[in-house]
Amino acid sequence: MAEENKTNRDDLTFEEAMKGLEQIVSKLEEGDVPLEKAIDYFQEGMALSKICHEKLQNVEKQMDFILRENGELAPFSVREEEKGDR
C-alpha cells in the first residue's frame, strides 16, 4: 500500500502536492494528533515537500532558457539595475 501511495504522489501536480502539504500542516498544528499518526503525517509531508521542491527545480531549469529570435534556446539571466543605471 505504501508503494501505491508513492505512485499516486508521483502523479500529483505542484498545486495538489502543496494542498496536501497544507492539510498535513493544519492537522499537525491542531496538536491533538497521536504520536504514531503525527509521524505518519510528517513522513507524508516530507514526501510532498520533496515533490514540490523537484517540480520547482524543474520549472527553474526551464526558465533558465528563453527563445532567441532565431528559435534557439539561450540562457536567461536577469540583470538588476545598478544604482548608477538610473
Swiss-Prot record:
Catalytic activity: Exonucleolytic cleavage in either 5'- to 3'- or 3'- to 5'-direction to yield nucleoside 5'-phosphates
GO biological process: DNA catabolic process
SUPFAM superfamilies named among the record's database cross-references: XseB-like
Statement: the UniProt record of this protein carries the keyword Cytoplasm: yes
Top enzyme category: hydrolase
Transmembrane segments: none
A GO MF term: exodeoxyribonuclease VII activity
Family: Belongs to the XseB family.
Function: Bidirectionally degrades single-stranded DNA into large acid-insoluble oligonucleotides, which are then degraded further into small acid-soluble oligonucleotides.
Name of protein: Exodeoxyribonuclease 7 small subunit
Organism expressing this protein natively: Bacillus licheniformis (strain ATCC 14580 / DSM 13 / JCM 2505 / CCUG 7422 / NBRC 12200 / NCIMB 9375 / NCTC 10341 / NRRL NRS-1264 / Gibson 46)
Gene expressing this chain: xseB
